[in-house]
Amino acid sequence: MEQLKQGLSGAQEHVHRAVQSATPIVNDALGKMQHFMAPYILQARSFADNHAAPAMHRVQPFMQQVQARIQKGFQHSTASIDASLHGLQPWQVAAVTAVVVLLTLWALTWLQAAFAEVRETGFVQSLIDFLKTLPGIRGLVKREHTKMMVKLRASINKSLLNGGEQHLQLPKKGLPAQQIISSLEKRGQHDVPFDEGASTVSGTLYLSGEAHCALLNDVYTRFSHTNPMHADVFPSVRQMELEVLAMTAAMVGGGPEGDPEVCGAMTSGGTESILTAVKASRDYMRAKRGIKHPEMVVGQSAHAAFFKAAEYFKVKLVVVPVGKDMRVTAAAVARALTRNTVLVVASSPCFPHGVIDDVEGIAQVASKAGVCCHTDACLGGFVLPFAHKLGYPVPAWDFSVPGVTSMSLDSHKFGMAHKGTSVVLYRSKGIRRYQYTRITDWSGGLYISPGFAGSRSGALISTAWASMIHQGEEGYLRITDQMMKAAGAFAKGLQQIEGLQLAGSPAMTVVAFRASKPRALNIYALNDLMSQRGWHLSALQLPPALHMCFTGQHASIVDSLLKDLQECVDILQKDSTGIKDGMAPIYGLASVSPDRKIIGEFLVAYQDVLLSG
């Protein structure tokens, strides 16, 4: 203790000496500063005396009048209140005051909520919502909604088994296997037929090659009983999942030749991969920077799953417009960033137009701001790496780009596996851990889950593994070259059709197009005419357009597709009204209607019919 006292005494003496030695220096500096500032202070005082004082002298009488009026009004108001409360008991005055305060607070809360609603939905939508509450308009909307439901149900239910066998309750006795197979064959006759290499449907069917399909079916059968949640029971499935993740990471800038820290997890599809990445990024940024009101910046062309994620996870969605080339730029993203931004998104490519956003620029903006950056490669993940190796012009888009923190890519699309598998990758395990769910106080035991699902199909994981092993790099190169050539030939031929033009410059196998003169050619009527000829193109909006996604099943359809497009355009140019029935009126209404809520109600009605018949 004595040593401690001596140490403190010595420290105190050192501090005292330091202060004594510093005091003259500080005083000298202050003196010099005062001497330097003296002329400026004199000038400021002179200006105030010459200009400010006369101005205040002129304003002073006016201010005195204003003050007198305010004082008089205040006195009048207090006198009126005193008169109105005259004769009331103190408790009555207190009660009236409490009621007035509560009513005022209620009114302020209501106004705040109303203004927030207007800010969120926009003034036009808010005005439309108010008009729809008026008695006459409300009844009209209800009647039109009923008519729409009747027509919609009749149109959709055409594809159901009219008069055929249906099972709406469990049969009293189980049916024999042969009868079940026979029933399935009859039901399958209502589906769109597919000929190998000659699909008439945009995207949808990504598997190609009879031998490849047979292999995957066999693999699925062998592992149909497995569940990776029980890794100790099915270690083979765990091993296959690890290998799928490793092979996928190595394709897109991870692995031994890239960033070895890239890691991930398998999901049920692209939407779940996107949802998982958004959830992980939100929670990571909350832990890292304490962001409690998260925002996510996406392009207008970003996949709908990001809109779904924003709704699910209470993340404010900030949508930025695309340029004339349909790409999201770094400048647009930079303008949208705030202190609450947790994630920015770039598409590689975007679903609507097949173009790749400025991933390098967007990732740089995100890195500078210290926020996460996701590149959505659900479509491009199993095409762009091989297109690049084949020599096609592919901008940087994967984990080789600094600042990219997560990625989604679908093994069940161009990875050519069975439907139900996708991959979400992260720059590091430090981000991936935020997609996990861990429960430590459950009576059922300690619980950890890598994603939203508990049980998962080991059979689907095994088919993804088998597909990648069966195709190999050589197989993916061959199929990619075939698809790129088909898409290129279609894009070139499309530009020869008068009345149509490309919507963006396609980066891979998605080719979007629109009318060069929308008033002269209804692109949705064109889609209806093509549907009558058996084609199933994807209809887009904002702006109105169509697209064709080429897969391994479209090797031989380019010429026939271009031929039918040319003939249908010729028909519409002669008769612009097109056909009476079809989706053109609905899509046309959706593209111009300012009432987005009524369009949303139509979509809900459509989904209800699909689920209930």
Regions found by a protein language model. Name each.
Residues 2-238, 242-246, 250, 255-257, ...:
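Non-catalytic terminal extensions of PLP-dependent enzymes
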Residues 286-342:
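PLP-dependent aminotransferase-like
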Residues 259-261, 503-510, 541-545:
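Short Gly/Ser/Thr- and Asp/Glu-enriched loop/turn motifs at secondary-structure junctions
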Residues 241, 245-246, 260-291, 305-309:
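Conserved beta-loop-alpha segment that forms the PLP phosphate-binding cup at the N-terminus of a helix
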Residues 328-375:
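Active-site phosphate-binding strand-loop segment of PLP-dependent enzymes
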